[in-house]
Regions:
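Generic low-complexity, intrinsically disordered sequence content enriched
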Residues: 14-18, 71
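Serine residues within intrinsically disordered or low-complexity segments
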Residues: 4-5, 15
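Acidic/glycine-enriched connector segments
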Residues: 22, 29-134
């Protein structure tokens, strides 16, 4: 039920929620050419980013952190908690990343099992998703 006194707050909430997006950037740990990746990423990133969400690993995750700094955007990192989840920690971390994001931008390579896991989770949650092969 929306009461007339709450309409302004609701409109503000909806405009913030859909105009500003938390974008998850996930991908291969073997990526090594930041400048080439940055050119690709800047060509596909939405303009209305409020935050970058990533996993704190090497490769694309490190690129995402660097790009967030260069763009002056906040970075939210979910690192795997091996003490709590053991070998399944990266998959739990992927769930946390996807849950926190409005939009998922994935950069898989041939061996990107974790990236494909995040892609599957984003699809299952009907998240906005863009997959760019490296």
């Amino acid at each position: 039920i929306i009461r007339s006194s709450n309409v302004g707050a609701l409109c503000l909430y909806l405009s913030f929620k859909y105009v500003f997006m938390k974008v998850a950037i996930v991908g291969s740990r073997s990526a090594s050419d930041y400048e080439a990746w940055k050119k690709l990423a800047l060509g596909v990133l939405p303009e209305n980013i409020s935050m970058i969400v990533s996993g704190g690993a090497m490769g694309i995750d490190a690129f995402a952190a660097r790009l967030a700094g260069e763009l002056g955007l906040p970075l939210l990192e979910f690192k795997p908690d091996y003490g709590k989840y053991g070998r399944g920690a990266p998959l739990v971390r992927n769930t946390e990343i996807v849950n926190a994001a409005d939009y998922v931008l994935a950069f898989p390579s041939g061996e990107s099992k974790g990236t494909y896991d995040a892609i599957r989770k984003a699809r299952k949650q009907n998240k906005r998703l863009r997959v760019c092969a490296l």
